[in-house]
Each structure stands twice: as structure tokens, then as C-alpha cells.
Amino acid sequence: MSDILAKIEAYKREEIAAAKQACPLSELEARAREASAPRGFVKALRSKHASGDYALIAEVKKASPSKGLIRADFDPPVLARAYEAGGAACLSVLTDTPSFQGHLDFMVAARAATALPVLRKDFMFDTYQVIEARAHGADCILIIMAALDDAAAADIEMAALDSGMDVLIEIHDRAELDRALKLRSPMIGINNRNLRTFETTLATSESLAPLVPKERLLVGESGIFTPADLSRLAQVDIQTFLVGESLMRQADVTAATRALLARNAASASAAE
């Protein structure tokens, strides 16, 4: 595990302990059972593919450790509706506060504003966080293989699947991919950003994507800014993209989302 992830795990463990004191697991489980049913994250992505379109997971992201504040006028419901209008298939909402200035309330508000399925984008270290995600309405959670051993990843995945949620399994090298393929979830996210150096290159996806079985659903993450980037990754059968920063920096998020996806729409028109 990188030094960055080790520091994150330390503060997440403190957060989890405090949350368990404030809301015991039994109470959280009751809230999760009463939450609105999961909307089907993977289903929404595959529906876009079936229509011949790229599938966009659009990220609601206020800040990041490497870039600082990304969007000052940060309004999750407004941004969520803008993404939906622009053609996004799903949403990703940062809920980590220390590193990303995120919050669970942002996810709740974004989901309530749209009909799109929502990923709780956070660092998962404990199954308590999975139940917490479902209790707040999440449709999907993230597993970062670089942050977990195999047993912990399997436990967190099982808790999510048992709750009716989907799981995005994130990897950024061959060893993590081999471990991820032992899990049950179809979604494999290839993070083009090295978590140790923060260097970002689409070559990471290009080298790893051909190693993933065809029945899996590949997601390209990080370093994706233009229609040309989408086209480049589509050459290695990546048809789903998680994009945040480049869209969050735009004044007109709906127009920017449409523009990002426009090449695919143009290609579809040309083929008709």
C-alpha cells in the first residue's frame, strides 16, 4: 500500500470508529432496509451500450488532493441534473471529506435530484461503510484493490452484493487486476493515475484492458478529457468512462457532457 493510502486508511479507521459509536450497525442495517431500492448501476451502463452509445459515469467532485478546489460554485443537485441532461448514464459522488471535501449528504442530494444510479465514491475499509452507503441510498460502491487485501475486498464485495448494490473494482496494475478477477463483480475500473506518483497516462488502460475477459465491464478512470480520449480507449474495448474534473471545471456542465459524448453520437449517425 502506498504512503498516501496508508494515511487515508488511518483517518478512515478513525471515522468508521466514530460512526459506529454514533450509529450502531443494527440501527444502520434497519435504515438500509428502508432505503429506496437500488436503481441498477451496471444495468444502466449496459443499457447505453445496447443503444450503441458510450456510457458515462459523471462525477460530482468539489476538490481533490492533487488539484485542490475544482469547483467553487458546488451544488450537487444542480450538477447532477446537468449531467443527466447531458446524457450521463450514472453518477459518482465523492463522500470523503478530508481529501475531497465530499460528504454523504452530497450523494443523497444528487441522487434525489435525478433518476440516475449513484456510486458512493469513497475509500472502503469496513463492511460498516457498505451498509452506510446503502442506508443513504447508494446504488454502487467502490473497491480499491491497492487499499485492501483479498479477504477484505471479498468481504466488502459480499456485503454490497447482499445489499443489492453493484461494485466498481478499481485497479491500476497487472497484479491488482489478477486479484480483482477473483471477485464476482463484473465492473473493472482501470485507474490511469498512479496512486504513488500521481502520474496519469491512458497507456495504463491500453496495456491492461486486453487482459480483461470480454464478459467483464471495463471502466476507464482518470486522465479522460476529450472525445479523442474516449475514442482512444474505445480501441481497447473500453466503452464506459468515469469523468469528473474536466467536466466539473466547465461553466456549462450539460453542454460539456454532451460535447464529450458527441463523437459517439456523430459516429452513430454516420453509420445509419
UniProtKB/Swiss-Prot annotation:
Key word ATP-binding present: no
Key words, A-Z: Amino-acid biosynthesis, Aromatic amino acid biosynthesis, Decarboxylase, Lyase, Tryptophan biosynthesis
Pathway(s): Amino-acid biosynthesis; L-tryptophan biosynthesis; L-tryptophan from chorismate: step 4/5
The keyword Amino-acid biosynthesis appears for this protein: yes
Entry's EC annotation: 4.1.1.48
Catalytic activity: 1-(2-carboxyphenylamino)-1-deoxy-D-ribulose 5-phosphate + H(+) = (1S,2R)-1-C-(indol-3-yl)glycerol 3-phosphate + CO2 + H2O
Gene3D superfamilies referenced in this protein's UniProt entry, alphabetically: Aldolase class I
PROSITE patterns, alphabetized: IGPS
GO biological process entries: L-tryptophan biosynthetic process
GO function term, MF aspect, one: indole-3-glycerol-phosphate synthase activity
NCBIfam families xrefs: PRK00278.1-2 (NF001370), PRK00278.1-6 (NF001373), PRK00278.2-4 (NF001377)
Family according to the record: Belongs to the TrpC family.
Protein's UniProt name: Indole-3-glycerol phosphate synthase
Gene: trpC
